[in-house]
């Protein structure tokens, strides 16, 4: 991703087809040591392609991917388990209420 970001920075800055040394110099300004193989791979993949068209195609593909997870619903038939769970929750709430009343707010630094 960092290689692509450097490539995009260079193209936005006016370089029509950034070279490997251009990308490496951008990355070195922020303290990243570039891997020559990855830079060459990126350049070969993007060579001769219009960046705006690639971004538009990527946005179109991303729009088809669901971004929010579906809400998980429990399976039907768990009434007995639900009753036990609610009883356990009530017991926890009672314990929490008892604990908070014990020190009357003055036991913080005792």
UniProtKB/Swiss-Prot annotation:
Low complexity bias (residue ranges): 73-88
Main localisation: cytoplasm
Superkingdom as given in the UniProt entry: Eukaryota
Gene Ontology molecular function, alphabetical: structural constituent of ribosome
CDD domains: Ribosomal_P2
Post-translational modification Phosphoserine, affected residues: 100
Keywords, alphabetical: Cytoplasm, Phosphoprotein, Ribonucleoprotein, Ribosomal protein
The UniProt record lists the keyword Cytoplasm: yes
Residue span of region Disordered: 73-110
Record-level GO cellular component terms: cytosol; cytosolic large ribosomal subunit
Keyword Cytoplasm tagged: yes
Binding partners and assembly: Component of the large ribosomal subunit (LSU). Mature yeast ribosomes consist of a small (40S) and a large (60S) subunit. The 40S small subunit contains 1 molecule of ribosomal RNA (18S rRNA) and at least 33 different proteins. The large 60S subunit contains 3 rRNA molecules (25S, 5.8S and 5S rRNA) and at least 46 different proteins. The acidic ribosomal P-proteins form the stalk structure of the 60S subunit. They are organized as a pentameric complex in which uL10/P0 interacts with 2 heterodimers of P1 and P2 proteins.
Note from the entry: Yeasts contain 4 individual small ribosomal A proteins (RPA) which can be classified into two couples of similar but not identical sequences. Each couple is distinctly related to one of the two A proteins present in multicellular organisms. Rpa3 and rpa4 are essential for cell survival, whereas rpa1 and rpa2 are not.
Known role: Component of the ribosome, a large ribonucleoprotein complex responsible for the synthesis of proteins in the cell. The small ribosomal subunit (SSU) binds messenger RNAs (mRNAs) and translates the encoded message by selecting cognate aminoacyl-transfer RNA (tRNA) molecules. The large subunit (LSU) contains the ribosomal catalytic site termed the peptidyl transferase center (PTC), which catalyzes the formation of peptide bonds, thereby polymerizing the amino acids delivered by tRNAs into a polypeptide chain.
Family that this chain belongs to: Belongs to the eukaryotic ribosomal protein P1/P2 family.
Protein name, per record: Large ribosomal subunit protein P2B
Species per Swiss-Prot/TrEMBL record: Schizosaccharomyces pombe (strain 972 / ATCC 24843) (Fission yeast)
Gene name, Swiss-Prot/TrEMBL: rpp202
């Amino acid at each position: 991703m960092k290689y692509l970001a450097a490539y995009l920075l260079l193209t936005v800055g006016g370089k029509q087809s950034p070279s490997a040394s251009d990308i490496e110099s951008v990355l070195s300004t922020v303290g990243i040591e570039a891997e020559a193989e990855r830079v060459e791979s990126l350049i070969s993949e993007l060579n001769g392609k219009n960046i705006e068209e690639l971004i538009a195609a990527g946005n179109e593909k991303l729009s088809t991917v669901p971004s929010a997870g579906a809400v998980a619903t429990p399976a039907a038939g768990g009434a007995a388990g639900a009753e036990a769970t609610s009883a356990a929750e009530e017991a926890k709430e009672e314990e929490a209420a008892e604990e908070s009343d014990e020190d009357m707010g003055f036991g913080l630094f005792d």
